[in-house]
């Protein structure tokens, strides 16, 4: 299979899975394994196409991101979504990522560990659906600092490949009495700084694997993931309120079973 086709396929996978509760990292590892596209070059490629998904969220939520630069609501202690909410949502995952980054990259980026993460994340999502109570926050401006921190702590689970950042944070939001839409939007916003930081760190460590010859492949993957992520996020927000997390959880379990039976055994 040509590099361009591989880039196109993985770009679609990244764009679809990055902000859906199905684990983009897990899917990239599993699909990369099936395509025979693995190793350091593959890891560097994954970093680049994640930037495409990051750019999609930055554009979709640019007004909200710009508003976070206004510190007046924070200084006046207004009950309005502000930068401190984002800090509380990001800080736990940053600490966990810095402490565990090398261990995770060395030992956990394997197909069998992803299968475990897919199932564990699915169990959390089903648990959140069963145990969720009536929401008290229906918009980002309703979000309390305690709810933001709770969601941030759940984001730490996403350092394990296959668990899913969106799945973890949206589940945490439901358990903290945040509705689907608000939990999803907050999940997207706190994913940005974490992804930028993690991607930047990975890029610094992987830049030696970049080659001028790889530019066409990387460009196709980047552009594809950007376009697909834009479409996926808009569609997901509309879909989630109708169907909830359970269908995504069942898909994760089915994928884990099929991959184990047909590939790992």
UniProtKB/Swiss-Prot annotation:
It comes from the Bacteria. Its EC number is 3.6.1.27. It is a multi-pass membrane protein. Keywords: Antibiotic resistance, Cell membrane, Cell shape, Cell wall biogenesis/degradation, Hydrolase, Membrane, Peptidoglycan synthesis, Transmembrane, Transmembrane helix. One of its GO terms (cellular component) is plasma membrane. GO terms for molecular function: undecaprenyl-diphosphatase activity. It is found in: Cell membrane. The keyword Hydrolase applies. The keyword Membrane applies. It catalyses: di-trans,octa-cis-undecaprenyl diphosphate + H2O = di-trans,octa-cis-undecaprenyl phosphate + phosphate + H(+). Belongs to the UppP family. PANTHER family: UNDECAPRENYL-DIPHOSPHATASE. NCBIfam families: PRK00281.1-1 (NF001388), PRK00281.1-2 (NF001389), PRK00281.1-4 (NF001390), undec_PP_bacA (TIGR00753). Bacitracin is thought to be involved in the inhibition of peptidoglycan synthesis by sequestering undecaprenyl diphosphate, thereby reducing the pool of lipid carrier available. This is Undecaprenyl-diphosphatase 1. The gene is uppP1.
